[in-house]
Each structure stands twice: as structure tokens, then as C-alpha cells.
Amino acid sequence: GLIETLTAVDTTVLVIGAGQAGLSIAARLRQMDIDCLVVERNGRVGDNWRKRYQALVLHNQRTVNHLPYIQFPEVWPEYLPKDMVAGWFEYYVQALELNVWCSTEFVTASFDEKSGHWRAHLVCEGEERHLKPRHIIMATGVSAIPDRSPVEGLQDFKGVVMHSADYHSATPWV
């Protein structure tokens, strides 16, 4: 169904993150007829891939990266470029009619023992939203938030200091 029609009462499961894990669980829940909403902080499904460094490709073969129900096309490269993965994720959401809210930040949640539901606080395109799902699944990935721990002596280093999350291309150094 369309996201616009989804209400807090309708939401059985709230999935945080529209990457490979979040979309996979949403697809499985849909096949089980369990209402599910996926929220993604990026502006588009697949942006978690699109926004990474220019030369990124999957580090293992296409055949071990399939999502449930619809496999990557066999004619695609063995090691998929990031933009192909990103586009596939968007297609996957449309093909399986998954409910996804993009530009949505998960702020916090607390469990209400009395009702047996969560109280989830979201900000969707700048607007606060409150949902009451029965379950919340965190599918935020392993590298969603860069670790910028202090490094002793870093302030004395004369070269360029850059976190890998900020690297997009070698062009400035070529």
C-alpha cells in the first residue's frame, strides 16, 4: 500500500533503515501479511550507497548479495557498482510495494507496558510524527555513523585529515 495511507494504528512493525537488512525484513513481513513501515533518514532509498565514494563496488559476488524474492539480474557485473545497488534498492521497494518514508529521522522510542506498543518519535521532512508500532527493528547498518574519536597528536599533523565517511573521490589528489 501507499505510505500516505499508513497510520500509527496500522503499523505493526517499524523498521529503522532502508538498506539491505531493512528492505529484506520488510519484504519478508509483507509476504507474511504483517503491516510494516520502513523509515530512512536519507532523501531516497539507496542513498546510503549513492553517497559513498565514487569507485565503490560490492566486495563480494552479486550472487551472495541478493535480496529476498527478487534476485539481481544475471547479466549484471559480478561485483556490483554502488549506483547499481542503489537503483536496485529503489526498484525493489516499488516492485514489492514496500512502505518507506524517506527523509525521516528516528528520534527515540519508549515501550508502553500497558498497551504493549512502542511510542516512536520520528521527524519526517521536518515534521514530527508519532507512531505506535508493536515492534521496532533496528536495521541501521554497521557504518551508518562515523566514529570520530579523538586521536592523540592529530592536531600536530600537517597533512590532510579525512574520515573515510568523508572520502568520495581521489580527484583532488590526482
What is each residue range found by the language model?
Residues G1-L6, L67, V75, P81-M84, ...:
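Glycine-rich dinucleotide-binding loop and its adjacent helix/turn
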Residues D10-T12, S103, V174:
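Phosphate-coordination loops involved in phosphoryl transfer and adenosine-cofactor binding
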Residues D10-V38:
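N-terminal Rossmann-like FAD-binding beta1-loop-alpha1 element of flavoenzymes
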